[in-house]
Amino acid sequence: MNSVSDRFALFIDGPNLSATARALGFDIDFRRLLREFHGYGRLLRATYYTPVIEGQENPLITWLDQNGYTVVTKATKEFVDASGRRKIKKSVNVELAVDAMDLAGYMDRMVLFSGDGGLRSLVQAVQRRGVRVTLVSTVASQPPMIAAELRRQADVFVDLRELRPRISRDPS
């Protein structure tokens, strides 16, 4: 993937990664995922972004926070759209983008776990600062879990199914 002297950070769009793994038929073992990337260079930070419903316990968030991940949460917001339907706003893209731009001057590579095409501008912005972007998602599902324009923008694309044997949770 890169030189062992590269400084890099993991940016994980939690809901997107979970949906992608589910589409491929497995669950992520986050301990194994972190171990997988430790040998790829100097890991500056592994950040997991997720929306939360206030007052609701989430054991995964607690575990991640205690096991080497920085966890960034954002409270979901309910609103009524133009057609009068109730919707829940649950995107963490802004938080992820702000953190990535803050770290851009300190990292050589960004590893982004997401397929959200809304992050293409972020990828372009960090690339302009000299950061190489590795994108992790999948094209193996129907429909693909990654926006085509995001995949084309990345310097390297890694299909999550290739990582499955090394990062999937044991079914026990």
Residue ranges, per PLM feature:
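Short, structured coil segments at secondary-structure junctions
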Residues: 67, 129, 150-153
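Active-site histidine-anchored catalytic micro-motif
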Residues: 105-148
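Short, well-ordered beta-strand core segments
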Residues: 70, 110, 157-158
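Short glycine-/acidic-enriched loop or helix-start segments at secondary-structure transitions
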Residues: 21-22, 58, 122-123, 145, ...
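Short, charged, intrinsically disordered terminal tails
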Residues: 1-3, 165-172
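Short loop/turn motifs at secondary-structure junctions
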Residues: 42-44, 106, 153
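Structural recognition of alpha->loop->beta junctions
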Residues: 97-101, 144-169
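Domain-level signal for Mg2+-assisted phosphodiester chemistry and nucleotide/NA-binding surfaces
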Residues: 1-92, 102, 132, 138-142
